[in-house]
Amino acid sequence: MTLCPDSTVSLISPSIVNHAFCSDAPLKLGIMASGNGSNFEAIAQAIKDGQLFAEIQVLIYNNPDAYAAVRANNWGVPSILVNHRDYKNREEFDKQIVQILQQHNIEWVIMAGWMRLVTPVLLDAFPNKIINIHPSLLPSFKGTHAVEQALSAGVKITGCTVHLLSLEMDSGPILMQAAVPVLPDDTPETLHARIQIQEHRILPMAICALLSSEAIALAVQTQP
């Protein structure tokens, strides 16, 4: 049995920390990304370092220029382009994604910078088995410009959140969070870079902890 990484980041959900043991068999992950793929890299590195007992079976990306595909190739992970522009609606798009994930026998779906809204087609295929990471302390600052929203609001602390996916954008039970201070001279770029450092820490930790079904149940039950 493999222990999860040390839980040293502030504001980590106690319901997750109490169940921080990984399973006896490697978890089969399917990762979805739209851009740079730095969170994909963090997960792959955590697996290599023995911090996460899992296997990345496939990367699905929707943007032909996504650097995440290059990262997947570097790690020897199959990557499949599913361009949303090729589908008449979101349901058809999600059907193709579900087919790929099922073909690879995926147990958990990790949205690591996935920039598309999902439909019940995907959610129903993997109920309570999809997690997302977002660059704010949800429920504050939802959407694609969370970092800019935090700066505009003048908050002194922001951060990142790992949560179970739901149909509503950037909602669903919160699993793990990490706080990041907002500095007086921060720009969207500098703040986002510091948030990503914490994303790269807590996403592998959350994946590892979620191997406990009790942790999932606790997170769902305690959600307002």
Where are these regions (language model features)?
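Donor/substrate-binding cores of folate-linked one-carbon enzymes
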Residues: 46, 112-221
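An anion-binding loop in the catalytic cleft
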Residues: 2-26, 51, 184, 197-224
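Conserved acidic residues
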Residues: 57, 107, 128
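Short, surface-exposed acidic-centric catalytic microdomains
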Residues: 52-96
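N-terminal glycine-rich "phosphate-gripper" loop used for MgATP/nucleotide binding
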Residues: 61-62, 85-86, 90-91, 104-120
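Short, well-structured alpha-helical segments in soluble
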Residues: 95-103
